[in-house]
Amino acid sequence: LLFLFPHETIAQERAIIKIDTDRVIDQINPHLYGNFSEHLGQGIYGGIYDPKSIQADEDGFRKDVIEQTKELKVSILRWPGGNFVSGYHWEDGIGDRSKRPTRIDLAWGGKESNMIGTDEFIQFARKAKVEPYFCVNLGTGSLDEARNWVEYCNVEKGTYYSDLRRKNGFEKPHKVTYWGLGNEVDGPWQMGHKSPEDYSKMAIETAKLMRWIDKDIKLIASGSSNYDADWNK
């Protein structure tokens, strides 16, 4: 074959790729351009929130981070992100900041001040024009904790948790649509690590109660983090 097709001829052959920008195949889901904010390093404190920074706005959020988030056109932002989820109890992070408990962060070490909680993250999301996406604790958390969080965020008034939100200064419901059911529960490094069977049972029951509070929410289950390739089966 080399005698039939000289080296020079082979080397000169080129592939041509044509890109037709006028041909629309389908629309890309804007949520593909989402991200998550994690309580690790300076992801939260010193990152999106730093009241001592010269970039801080009146609520302590960094204006440069807000503007860059807008510039990147981040569509949806998950919180709390990562392993921190499995030890986080949302009621620690609401109400008077001076009365919020400081907890040991079992995921990453150090201490969690709870200065950024549900209402503060909603404030940041609104400023940055991103869709908030909350992830519930299915590691050390409970069914009640998950459904109460939906009540706090999405019920207008007249119940314990909706009225608690109003007492905390947020009369209108936050209307959080997207909710994740746990984080990397397949991994033994995770607080509350579960087998596929145990996770499925808890996720189904948690989803049921959450939807009884608000039927319009959208739920995202936790799949394998690639630790165990067969976990999803």
Which residues make up each language-model segment?
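Non-catalytic accessory regions flanking glycosidase/transglycosidase catalytic cores in CAZymes
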Residues: 10-232
